[in-house]
Amino acid sequence: MITTLLRRSLLDASKQATSINGILFHQLAPAKYFRVPAVGGLRDFSKMTFEKKKTSEEEEGSGDGVKVNDQGNKGEQLIVSYWGVKPMKITKEDGTEWKWSCFRPWETYKADLTIDLKKHHVPSTLPDKIAYWMVKSLRWPTDLFFQRRYGCRAIMLETVAAVPGMVGGMLMHFKSLRRFEQSGGWIKALLEEAENERMHLMTFMEVAKPKWYERALVISVQGVFFNAYLIGYIISPKFAHRMVGYLEEEAIHSYTEFLKELDNGNIENVPAPAIAVDYWRLEADATLRDVVMVVRADEAHHRDVNHYASDIHYQGHELKEAPAPIGYH
């Protein structure tokens, strides 16, 4: 009985001490930094403290706020990140703010319009002939479907043309990791090509508004082409690059026809999209015709790079043995 009384006395004393400590804690700790829940453990206390701090930072407009103003978004958003990752504040040469987050000023360039557009690789081997006629066979259904709607045709073309560089760069990236060896810069060159083709697409999306069934066609064609090209590149890189070279030759032809329609007045020569003006460093009063001219020049450079890559393989070498044409515009 004495033992039981002693236990009860110790338990009551412990409860009183805990209550006194809690009162002192509330009196001494500033409310700005601590919010102790009536029920719950340290986990709830930590969560409530972080939420209090986050709310306080949002109200006070702390430096962790990141303004996001990407083109195409509705208005501006204020994103508060615990990690404190902030975008660089970039300005143009004239001091105005750089408004594009998808590319930076040092990634822009002036296209080389003097490139020879008529260069052609004459197919001599069986793989070359197969690649050539495969690409030629794709022109007929494309002409039938799009006819003279060259804006939508360009969108379809660029969704396909952006695939080979990504596939080739991805496979070379894995090969470099697997073999513990450098790529000779070809990973960067091929991914650069894919990004350039994607920028073509983003530009023409500002000009042409594809219909829903054209968007569905893009999804289907891209899915089929990606898997087919992936298998083809694994089996024979020289065949894959040769086919892309011929595909780029067809792109040059397509954009040449686009220019003819613009010159004949069948397509309105609207002002160039703002993204195109900054990406290709065009004049402020540039038009759609100027955009088509620089895009066609890009395709000619991609033609050269892929035929060159195929020639390297045909000569019994690997791409890493030849310096990659990085920044070849």
Swiss-Prot record:
One of its GO terms (cellular component) is mitochondrion. Homodimer; disulfide-linked. CDD domains: AOX. Its main location: mitochondrion. InterPro entries: AOX, AOX_sf. This is Ubiquinol oxidase 1c, mitochondrial. The chain crosses the membrane at residues 154-174, 216-236. The gene is AOX1C. It is found in: Mitochondrion inner membrane. Its cofactor is Fe cation. Fe cation 2 binds at residues 197, 248, 299, 302. Expressed in roots, stems, leaves, cotyledons and flowers. High expression in stamens. Binds 2 iron ions per subunit. It catalyses: 2 a ubiquinol + O2 = 2 a ubiquinone + 2 H2O. It comes from Arabidopsis thaliana. It is a multi-pass membrane protein. Its EC number is 1.10.3.11. GO terms for molecular function: alternative oxidase activity; metal ion binding; superoxide-generating NADPH oxidase activity; ubiquinol:oxygen oxidoreductase activity. Belongs to the alternative oxidase family. Residues 1-45 form a transit peptide.
